UniProtKB/Swiss-Prot annotation:
NAD(+) binds at G240, S241, T242, E243, T244, G245. Homodimer. Dehydrogenase that can use N-acetyl-gamma-aminobutyraldehyde (NAGABald), gamma-guanidinobutyraldehyde (GGBald), betaine aldehyde (Bet-ald), gamma-aminobutyraldehyde (GAB-ald), acetaldehyde, 4-aminobutylaldehyde (AB-ald), 3-aminopropionaldehyde (AP-ald), 4-N-trimethylaminobutyraldehyde (TMAB-ald) and 3-N-trimethylaminopropionaldehyde (TMAP-ald) as substrates. Catalyzes the oxidation of GAB-ald more efficiently than Bet-ald. May convert acetaldehyde into acetate, thus facilitating the production of acetyl-CoA in peroxisomes under anaerobic conditions. Its EC number is 1.2.1.8. It comes from Oryza sativa subsp. japonica. Pathway: Amine and polyamine biosynthesis; betaine biosynthesis via choline pathway; betaine from betaine aldehyde: step 1/1. This is Betaine aldehyde dehydrogenase 1. Keywords: NAD, Oxidoreductase, Peroxisome. One of its GO terms (molecular function) is betaine-aldehyde dehydrogenase (NAD+) activity. SUPFAM superfamilies: ALDH-like. Induction: Following submergence treatment, transient decreased levels that recovers after re-aeration.
């Protein structure tokens, strides 16, 4: 598909329509594969956040919630299914925008759009099922009382999302929030906002009630921070860096506001000596080089049994050399650019520091020689790593994998858990009992056995330790946006009898 001659010029999507940012400022959109400026996005500030939150608040309570927050789940499901259908219709165009905006291979972006549509469809089904789960009875020990549970939308939610999977990560929050009956203000990363703005256009096309979903773009300090601190936002859901997540927690704590956080990771991949090496190498590659390694759950710490380490690394280098690194619009591209010049410089500094600290750059670590422009980095394999090195301890968020050897299962688990993070982990072995033991021992919210990075909308996603808390996807993702209310009634015709009635005069 040919690149469009111009990126659509969008405003902020507030109250069901487009409006220019209050200060009239816009931010350039740079194609990271070419370094060319291809358009711009509106730069929202606190005044725009106020308008968006007000629109969401109005939509939540309009006509007592009859049109959205208190409407039957089947009503909300109709809109979610309509959004999914539009995503499918526009799949090729949206994938192209995503590639131009973020630098990811077009094939990957197209797969992301399929996942976006599937996520909206899944939560449409859960919205419909929610009606049948209301008034769930609670068994009580006293016959003169009856009790049941209502699940109600938590209110207006602020959704702050990252740039690595721009529309998909937004959908992981938008779809369950809307299914629950919440109204929302979505603030995507300023580094990749184009497809999220197109979601606003889709909402307008399908007639989503005004204010149910509002989309503002801009800098984190100017748009994200006012959203996180707004007193009329009932919950914040954030995916991004651990440092930003800490600031959001501090802000929310001042108002006792619930938050869910999906933050950084430094996930391990443990490979034992009983594996098919080429199969395991491909999973190691996919676990750290897909999406140019810009994945929060990337298995960027590779732990190899000492008996196979040399053979494994020889094959890993051979496979890494075979990756097609190119303009992400080219057919067969498997490694595009990273998202921005800032991210490029950050990754290159990690590699430089690893070298200075005594690690070995076994392969990669530089710009591909055939690509003179764009923010491209070769797949990078780093060995002779100690556990005190920055490359072992900190999230790189790029196509960089560091390697250590182990001798025993116990040592492998200790190395795997030697991190402040706890998002994911993986183990590859033909001994399934060993895999089960390790899946219990790894301190993370997700464990993969004989694979790395599969993600299904039906299964919970989230981490432990400094990787955050709360779970997205599946029923757990819907529960993020629901408040549980207990309703108990007294059913006897007799007085309760706790107090003695006053004497009759």
């Amino acid at each position: 598909m040919a690149a469009p001659s111009a990126i659509p010029r969008r405003g902020l999507f507030i109250g069901g329509g487009w409006r220019e940012p209050s200060l009239g400022r816009r931010l350039p959109v740079v194609n990271p594969a070419t370094e060319a400026t291809i358009g711009d996005i509106p730069a929202a500030t606190a005044e725009d956040v106020e308008l968006a939150v007000s629109a969401a608040r109005d939509a939540f309570g309009r006509d007592g919630g009859r049109h959205w927050s208190r409407a039957p789940g089947a009503v909300r499901a109709k809109y979610l299914k309509a959004i999914a259908a539009k995503i499918k219709d526009k799949k090729s165009y949206l994938a192209l925008l995503e590639t131009l905006d973020s630098g990811k291979p077009l094939d990957e972006a197209a797969g992301d759009m399929e996942d976006v549509a599937a996520c909206f469809e899944y939560y449409a089904d859960l919205a419909e099922a929610l009606d049948g789960k209301q008034r769930a009875p609670i068994s009580l020990p006293m016959e003169n009382f009856e009790s049941y549970v209502l699940k109600e939308p938590i209110g207006v939610v602020g959704l702050i999302t990252p740039w690595n999977y721009p529309l998909l990560m937004a959908t992981w929050k938008v779809a369950p929030a809307l299914a629950a009956g919440c109204t929302a203000v979505l603030k995507p990363s300023e580094l990749a906002s184009l497809t999220c703005l197109e979601l606003g256009g889709i909402c307008a096309e399908i007639g989503l009630p005004p204010g149910v979903l509002n989309i503002i773009t801009g800098l984190g300090t100017e748009a994200g921070a006012p959203l996180a601190s707004h007193p009329h936002v009932d919950k914040i859901a954030f995916t991004g860096s651990t440092e930003t997540g800490k600031r959001i927690m501090i802000t929310a704590s001042q108002m006792v506001k619930p938050v869910s956080l999906e933050l950084g990771g430094k996930s391990p991949l443990i490979v034992f000596d009983d594996v098919d090496i080429d199969k395991a190498v491909e999973w190691a590659m996919f676990g750290c080089f897909a999406n140019a390694g810009q994945v929060c759950s990337a298995t960027s710490r590779l732990l190899l049994h000492e008996k196979i380490a040399k053979r494994f690394l020889d094959r890993l280098v051979a496979w890494a050399k075979s990756i097609k690194i190119s303009d992400p619009l080219e057919e067969g591209c498997r490694l595009g650019s990273v998202v921005s010049e800032g991210q490029y410089q950050k990754i290159m500094k990690f590699i430089s520091t690893a070298r200075c600290e005594g690690a070995t750059i076994l392969y990669g670590g530089a710009r591909p020689q055939h690509l003179k422009r764009g923010f491209f980095i070769e797949p990078t394999i780093i060995t002779n790593v100690s556990t005190s090195m920055q490359i072992w301890r900190e999230e790189v968020f790029g196509p960089v994998i560091c390697v250590k050897e182990f001798r025993t299962e116990r040592e492998a688990v200790e190395l795997a858990n030697d991190t402040h993070y706890g998002l994911a982990g993986a183990v590859i072995s033909n001994d399934l009992e060993r895999c089960e033991r390790i899946s219990k021992a790894i301190q993370s919210g997700i464990v993969w056995i004989n694979c790395s990075q599969p993600c299904f909308v039906q299964a919970p996603w989230g981490g432990n330790k400094r990787s955050g808390f709360g779970r997205e996807l599946g029923q757990w993702g819907l529960d993020n946006y629901l408040s549980v209310k207990q309703v108990t009634k007294y059913c006897s015709d007799e007085p309760y009898g706790w107090y003695r009635p006053p004497s009759k005069l």
